[in-house]
Amino acid sequence: MKFALALCAAVLLVVLVQAEEKCTPGQVKQQDCNTCTCTPTGVWGCTRKGCQPAKREISCEPGKTFKDKCNTCRCGADGKSAACTLKACPNQ
């Protein structure tokens, strides 16, 4: 439930910020994994996909598991990538 509320708040913030930014009708831009198109009234309208967090470089022992906040990750065979659960962790 907390995750859903946080997600709604984030979407609302993005929409409010975008509403203040004027644009040329028909203009298109990318914002993270979302596509934004300028409406005929000169206001951005964007898709609201839940984007994956940005990837970061890691170094780990291949095959080993480790914690990332409240999520459990398993190190990839290359020692530079990992697959993690996607729990919404409470503020830590």
Swiss-Prot record:
Site (Reactive bond) residue list: 48-49, 86-87
Start and end residues of each Pacifastin domain: 20-54, 57-92
Extent of the signal sequence: 1-19
Superkingdom of origin organism: Eukaryota
Disulfide bonds: 23-38, 33-51, 36-46, 60-75, 70-89, 73-84
GO CC annotations, alphabetized: extracellular region
Compartments (UniProt record): Secreted
Sorted UniProt keywords: Cleavage on pair of basic residues, Disulfide bond, Glycoprotein, Protease inhibitor, Repeat, Secreted, Serine protease inhibitor, Signal
PROSITE patterns in the record: PACIFASTIN
Pfam family, one: Pacifastin_I
Entry's Gene Ontology molecular function annotations: serine-type endopeptidase inhibitor activity
Residues linked to a glycan: 65
Tissues where the protein occurs: Brain and fat body.
Keyword Repeat set for record: yes
UniProt entry tagged with the keyword Glycoprotein: yes
Protein function: Both LCMI I and II are inhibitors of chymotrypsin and elastase (in vitro). They both inhibit the prophenol oxidase activation cascade.
Family named by the database record: Belongs to the protease inhibitor I19 family.
Protein's UniProt name: Protease inhibitors
Species of the source: Locusta migratoria (Migratory locust)
